[in-house]
Regions:
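Exported/periplasmic ABC-transporter solute-binding proteins
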Residues: 1-126
């Protein structure tokens, strides 16, 4: 059973774009959350779906691609090809932003901010 996110989901859009299969997937079921996909895969033998690495737990098995495991090290090195970066964007440079935006960027780059990112299971900005 092939499971996916609903049309319009950013996760679905990125997955289909990375694999160049936009509008070609026939899902047996479309779910409205990453947690829903994870839970359905975990409870349905023979199913497959896609989720973000940060939500993978011991209820499912993350698949290797071309023998490469989906680990932080492999993603950062570029050897695990099914990944996408996120960026934070502003209009202009950080120095041109208001104090709240400057504080946010400072926090993300601080040890405390990095600890939060790591605790969430996300990969630190490089």
């Amino acid at each position: 059973m092939v499971l996916g996110r609903e049309a319009g989901s950013g996760t679905r859009g990125a997955f289909e774009e990375l694999l160049d299969v936009a509008d070609q997937c026939a899902y047996a079921q479309e779910l409205d959350s990453t947690g829903g996909v994870l839970a359905k895969v975990a409870s349905t033998p023979g199913s497959i779906g896609y989720v973000s690495l940060d939500v993978v737990d011991d209820t499912v098995k993350a698949l290797s691609l071309d023998g490469v495991e989906p680990t932080e090290e492999n993603i950062v090195a570029g050897s695990y090809k099914l990944s996408r970066p996120f960026v934070m964007a502003t209009l202009g440079t950080i120095d041109e932003q208001n104090d709240l935006v400057k504080t946010w960027f400072g926090f993300v780059q601080s040890d405390a901010g990095k600890a939060v990112i790591t605790a969430m299971g996300l990969i630190l900005p490089q």
